[in-house]
Design a protein with these regions (language model features):
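N-terminal, positively charged nucleic-acid-binding surface of large information/translation enzymes
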Residues: 4-184
Length: 184
């Protein structure tokens, strides 16, 4: 039996604005839209979010390659997403931009709580990094000019301070949860 009067929050990924929307963006958004519409038809309350992630080095570099300020580039691509969602009649309730004041304020509040929680620590991270993948890559230490196998571009050496999550702090709780039948 289906339970009615439930509350649902449905969100797409926040799409990177390093390039215009593509089929993968549409696919995910249409799937979320179908779920949101179904839940509304069932009488449930739905908050359907979509939006864009306007941070990252690949966005900055894309803007630079077009001789644009990063925010102007973000504004242009964001409008393309909104235009496409309107053309596809996507029924989102809120469009999130990671550069908006309300999002920035919420992130600052969350970040402040995380720092007080003792769940993170500062540490050094170094290695070969792919800007396109936004991740460190395992590379043979003899390779002096490694290439990303996905983007076919040279990796960059990074040595930086980052925040790390203290997963080990929750090891006992996680192990107990994993043992519960049906949890995973």
């Amino acid at each position: 039996e289906y339970i009615m009067n439930m509350k649902y929050t449905i969100t797409t990924p926040l799409y990177y604005v390093n390039d215009k929307p593509h089929l993968g963006s549409s696919y995910t958004t249409i799937a979320c839209d179908a779920i949101a519409r179904f839940q509304r038809l069932c009488g449930n309350t739905v908050l359907f979010l979509t939006g864009v992630d306007e941070h990252g080095q690949k966005i900055e570099r894309t803007a630079e390659s077009k001789n644009l300020q990063p925010q102007l580039h973000c504004d242009e691509i964001t409008e393309k997403y909104k235009y496409l969602w309107d053309k596809l009649n996507i029924s989102y309730d809120r469009f999130v931009r990671t550069t908006s004041e309300d999002h920035t304020s919420l992130v600052h509040q969350f970040y402040s709580k995380v720092l007080k929680s003792d769940d993170v620590y500062m540490g050094r991270q170094s290695g070969w990094y792919c800007v396109g993948c936004e991740e460190y890559k395992d590379v043979d230490e003899d390779d002096k000019s490694p290439i990303c196998s996905i983007h076919k571009k040279e990796l960059e050496w990074r040595d930086e301070e980052n925040l790390f999550f203290k997963l080990s702090k929750y090891q006992d709780q996680i192990e107990k949860l994993i043992q519960i039948d049906g949890f995973i």
